């Protein structure tokens, strides 16, 4: 069976922690930030956990499953 290729766009967007959680960046932070509150922008800086509904799909893209 051939080696499974990692989807490179997914590899740049997601990180897997030691505990197996998949972390992602928040959306709505790249532009049009002038109208957003400072607290909202600060909250968008933090990483977020990928939902369990999407976890298997992301793992398949990363070649881990």
UniProtKB/Swiss-Prot annotation:
Entry's Gene Ontology cellular component terms: cytosolic large ribosomal subunit
Signal peptide region: none
A Pfam family recorded for this sequence: Ribosomal_L35p
GO BP term (any one): translation
Superkingdom of this protein's organism: Bacteria
Keywords, comma-separated and alphabetical: Ribonucleoprotein, Ribosomal protein
PROSITE patterns: RIBOSOMAL_L35
Paired cysteines (S-S): none
One term of GO molecular function: structural constituent of ribosome
Family, similarity comment: Belongs to the bacterial ribosomal protein bL35 family.
Protein name listed in UniProt: Large ribosomal subunit protein bL35
Organism, as annotated: Thermotoga maritima (strain ATCC 43589 / DSM 3109 / JCM 10099 / NBRC 100826 / MSB8)
């Amino acid at each position: 069976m051939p080696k499974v290729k990692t989807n490179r766009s997914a590899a740049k967007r997601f990180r897997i922690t030691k505990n197996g959680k998949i972390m992602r960046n928040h959306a709505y932070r790249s532009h049009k930030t002038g109208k957003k509150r400072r607290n909202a922008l600060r909250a968008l800086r933090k990483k977020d956990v990928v939902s369990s509904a999407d976890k298997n799909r992301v793992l398949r893209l990363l070649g881990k499953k």
